[in-house]
Amino acid sequence: MTTDSQYQDFVPPHRLLMGPGPSMVHPRVLQALSQPLLGHLDPVFLTLMNDIQALLRATFHTQNEFTIALSGTGSAGMEAVIANLIEPGDRAIVGVNGVFGTRLATMIERSGGLPIRIEAPWGATIPIEALEQELARSAPVKAVVLVHAETSTGALQPLEDVGALCRAHDALLIVDAVTSLGGIPVEVDTWGIDACYSGTQKCLSCPPGLAPLTVSPRGMGAIRQRRAPCHSWYLDLSLIADYWNDHSRAYHH
């Protein structure tokens, strides 16, 4: 049986992509995708990893050592952060004002955590007063989880004062920046964010398939001190950290 006439080379039609993602990709990026492959432990590839980390730190506005590009979509970044920072029985306050706040609550449940939902109408944001009241009422709380820019509605969540509030209650701050990173400032260090993830196919205007991710030393401390290993081997950030470590670069994926 021959497939010569049945299947032809795929030539995609030209589209002007105007949605939140995937977005248009610069021709220079498309050209880079046509270059020969390198092995994942090739010295040139390892040097490229250093460059990627430096550029992502600038994009996230952070000095976090653990700043990487995770293999997977933005949802993989979401699941990696939740699976590593939320353990069974942990309480996590999650802002639910759209599709992705709802997804975060679901992932917290699947990790054995106890999501405390603060709901707002779709298109609205989560008031900081509601976060403060819930942090006091539900203590101890492991983390506050918020979507910076809710893709399903376009709502932009103010974050400037949330990090300090979380620290006052010994809670981590987890932020979904899938739609916002590269489009508006994401001030990870200034805002006191402990874990932040994004996706390459939105405002960064890259092909999908990578999840930029950064975790503060405080967040990495919580991961290293887990009561049990992360239930996901593939998304275990303690293992992935060793692959991105400047000194060891131990193979993981």
What is each stretch, according to the model?
Residues 14-71, 75:
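A glycine-/small-polar-enriched, mobile loop at the entrance of the PLP active site in fold-type I
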Residues 17-19, 68-71, 94, 117-118, ...:
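General beta-strand structural signal in soluble alpha/beta enzymes
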Residues 24-25, 201-253:
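Active-site C-terminal subdomain of aminotransferase-like
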Residues 65-93, 97, 101-105:
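Conserved beta-loop-alpha segment that forms the PLP phosphate-binding cup at the N-terminus of a helix
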Residues 103-114:
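Active-site-proximal loop->helix
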Residues 126-182, 195, 203:
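Active-site phosphate-binding strand-loop segment of PLP-dependent enzymes
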Residues 189-201:
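Conserved active-site segment immediately N-terminal to the catalytic lysine
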